[in-house]
Amino acid sequence: MSEMDEQQRLDILYQYEILDTPREHAFERIAALAKLIFDVPVVLISLIDENRQWFKSAIGFDTPETPRDHAFCNETIRSDEVLVISNAEQDLRTAKNPLVTGEPFIRFYAGAPLITPEQARLGS
């Protein structure tokens, strides 16, 4: 895949007009299924805009968004591959993240990029 610049990615994200919309049953079902399959306490469907990570669906995490620089998803959207961080305390990308060093003390992360037909990675 050729690299898409950040402005192109954001333009495509905004065209979907999904940011800050209410929760939707379809997304909630996907998150619930992921929680069941992977037996994890937290499942998020997130989108990354210029400054934040916004959650279209969230199970086990009550915050509607986080700053982009705290988003593990920010790493996920850099590749077409699934990102797995086995120990967030020891991974250089996440060890100093406030979500690792403080509440909710994230230790494990797995995320798959959400990729549009235009090959824009919008979130995870």
What are these regions (language model features)?
Residues 11, 41-42, 48-58, 63-107:
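Regulatory sensory and allosteric helical modules in signal-transduction proteins
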Residues 16, 29-37, 75, 79, ...:
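Amphipathic alpha-helical regulatory segments at dimerization interfaces
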Residues 107-118:
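A short, aliphatic-rich beta-strand micro-motif
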Residues 20-53, 68:
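Helix-loop-beta substructure at the N-terminus of cytosolic sensory domains
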Residues 118-124:
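Sensory beta-strand/linker motifs that couple input domains to effectors
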Residues 40, 109, 122:
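Short coil/loop residues immediately preceding or within conserved phosphate-binding loops
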Residues 1-24:
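Signal-transmission linkers at sensory-effector interfaces
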Residues 38, 104, 120:
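Structured loop/turn residues at beta-strand edges in well-structured enzyme cores
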